[in-house]
Amino acid sequence: MVKNNKGKVCNMYQDEYKRWLAADLEDADLKPELAKIEGNDDEIKDRFAVALKFGTAGLRGVLGAGTNRMNIYVVRQATQGLANWVKTQGGSQTVAISYDSRLKSDIFAKTASRCAFMMR
C-alpha cells in the first residue's frame, strides 16, 4: 500500500490487478489464475503491490500472473528496460539471449528476443 499526499492509503495494487483481469492477455494460462484470486486481498497484494526485482542473477521468481511474478509481461518490461540502458551506454546493440531447462525458460527467451529485436 502507498500513502497519497493526504496520508490516505491507496490500494494501487488492486487497480493493477483489475487492469490485468480486464485485459485481453496473450498468455491465456493467466486468466483462470487471476479469476481464482479475486477477493483474496493478501494474494493480490503479494502479486501486484511491487514489481519483480532484476538482480545480479537476472529475473527470478514464482511463475504466474502479476507484476511480482515471472511471466511474459514482466520479461518484456525488463527486456525493454535493459535495452534502453544499453543504448544509453553507447555500446554495441548486440545481445545474447539463451535459455535452460527451467519451466517456460524457452518462452521467456523468445519473448526477450522478440522484444530486443523490436528495440533495434
Task: Report residues per predicted region.
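Short, Lys/Arg-enriched N-terminal segments with co-localized hydrophobic residues
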Residues: M1-N11
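An N-terminal, well-structured beta->alpha segment
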Residues: M12, Y17-A112
